[in-house]
Structures are given as C-alpha cells and as structure tokens.
Swiss-Prot record:
Part of the 30S ribosomal subunit. GO terms for cellular component: cytosolic small ribosomal subunit. One of the primary rRNA binding proteins, it binds specifically to the 5'-end of 16S ribosomal RNA. Belongs to the universal ribosomal protein uS17 family. GO terms for biological process: translation. This is Small ribosomal subunit protein uS17. The lineage of its organism: Bacteria, Pseudomonadati, Pseudomonadota, Alphaproteobacteria, Magnetococcales. Keywords: Ribonucleoprotein, Ribosomal protein, RNA-binding, rRNA-binding.
Length: 83
C-alpha cells in the first residue's frame, strides 16, 4: 500500500525530535453541499530538530514511532516569516 503524503503548517516544535503539523482539507457537506474546511493535527518525526513553528512542510506516513507518532517530515516547502 502506498504511503500517504500531506502538506501542513508546523504549529508546535516544543518536543524533542517531534513537531505538530496542522493539515487542512476542504470537504463538501453531505447534506447541504457547502464546502467546509476540516483540520487535524498530526505528530511527525523531526530527527534534527530543524523545523520551526510556521514552516510549511510535507509529511509522509511511516511505521509507528511512538504511541501518537506515525508520520515523518520529509521536506520544508516554505519557511516561516519572522516578525
């Protein structure tokens, strides 16, 4: 089975070797047909602690690394703007 890949924003980098990534997707409401945004947070492995809050990253599904962590950060697509 192919590993899923998602894009999201790092919302927390306070843990060692772990970041929390917020992934948003658009879904059509089953009854009313309106497009609504759904978001979910994923814990992802960050081996070198190189990703910071606000970075746009790609995460890929992996084997379970801990109780809550099943994803690995593969690349940074946009750097956070400091200010």
């Amino acid at each position: 089975m192919a590993k899923r890949i998602m894009q999201g924003v790092v919302v927390s980098d306070k843990m060692d070797k772990t970041v929390v990534v917020l992934v948003e997707r658009k879904v059509r409401h089953p009854l009313y047909g309106k497009i609504v945004r759904q978001s979910k947070k994923y814990k992802a492995h960050d081996e070198e602690n190189q990703y910071r809050t606000g970075d746009m990253v790609m995460i890929q599904e992996s084997r379970p690394l801990s109780k809550d962590k099943n994803w690995v950060v593969t690349e940074r697509t946009a750097v956070a703007v400091e200010g």
